Amino acid sequence: MQARRYISLSLAAGAGALAAAATGTHRPNILVCMADDAGHMGAYGTPWVHTPAFDSIASRGILFRNAFTCNSKSAPSRACFITGRNSWQLREAANHWPAFPADIRSFPEALKDSGYYTGYTGKGWGPGIAQNADGSERELTGKKFNSRKLKPATTGINKIDYAANFGEYLKGWDHKSPLCFWYGAREPHRGYEYGSSARFGKHPADIDSVPAYWPDNETVRTDMLDYAVEIEHFDRHLGRIIEMLDSVGELENTIVIVTSDHGMPFPRCKGQEYLASCHVPLAIMWPCGIKNPGRVTDSLVSLTDIAPTIMEAVGLTEAETGMEPMSGRSLFPILNDTAAGIRPYLLLGRERHDPGRPDDQGYPIRGIIRDNLLYLRNYEPSRWPAGNPETGYMDVDGSHTKTEIIRARRNPATHYLWELSMGLRPEEELYDLSRDADCITNLAADPAYAAHLKALRAEMETRLRAEGDPRMEGRGDIFDRYPNKCESHQFYNRVKAGEKPPHKWINDSDFDNYGQK
């Protein structure tokens, strides 16, 4: 067995020392473990989700209680993660289903060029198209390892045996190069096998709290528990991968990063910019590199901070790797326990996600979080935030919960639930997260918050201008002009023309004649 490669905490203290270490054999391994649409883990006190592997990593490393993605859809969130840049800085990659810009590099590509053995299983970056100049597929997260399969426990769980594929990756390792592996589960992305949670001993009464923007009934609770089953599938493979890494003597010097691309795939969560949309679980473990492990931090951190953290750990810079300058910040002050936080604010935003509006229009939002306040600016409030009703609210994945909310519109007593998830929104929103984590009470028109509203609006726009956001320069329409690579592109226009284009992620019952009572 090869001797373990160590990088001491003293080396991590300075960029010069790190660069020196990176030229030798002491660079840390990197293990990224990303769930698909997971907003919950047991370590955060969720009694109906059991994640012993995640919880163990958090207890042996750092649990981040205020980690966020800036853009809560798979492709743009993952683009931010692998580049260290906010989505409005990524041109086409700000959108869902884009063509990834050929001149924007990912950190796994940079690590591969510097001698790392890279690979991934499951879902890397996507959905979208990423190609080299010759038309071949780019390995944005490494070489694909998806050949090993399993018999899924439910019809909603993917057949890829993630842990076994990590084993296949290790078989090709030369035992000299440092490792960089991406475990990208496709769970808990929809669809689910409705009611499968009962086979795993789960009961609707297990749910301690249903968000205030959904009906609290057995159907919704069952949907939540089916989602929990898939998170637990992710966690089981996480545990197996950690055991395998330990068995080859490499866990001690591996930076293990466990997170999700965004929040849960339910109405008013995934695809929006509320707390449940953008807040993500995050635990980082590095046995020989984190000072005072077992900590919990409330520092505001972004998924854009992961790439600069990794680059600092391995001793590389953007300039020498050809990566674009990163807007994210290294987490080393937190890992070293030398600072309580790295920033007092976070920026959020989205552009075009799934189709379903005329001409494939997006729903542009920008936002900022500071001092437990969330400010959002909706730049096209006349557009439907969840997608047009008559084309199935395509920006919300089909589900039993979504069906319940569409039904709620027809009942005067529950119509407000439909308004919260599907209805039109004002130009500005402001929420006090310390008292209203569900983001129900919009304070934008409250005189008591007028000064906060003005200050947050000004700070957000100033910081976005500094980052070169086209929307701050009057060029925001460029995001709608970028090609849409989804097979359901121009869905609204095609439906209106009498076609029946594919709509895999929504149900036929989602199509809603808004005038119907």
What are these regions (language model features)?
Residues 457-475:
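Bilobed periplasmic-binding protein-like "clamshell/Venus-flytrap" ligand-binding domains
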Residues 476-481:
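A glycine-rich phosphate-binding loop feature that marks nucleotide/adenosyl-phosphate handling sites
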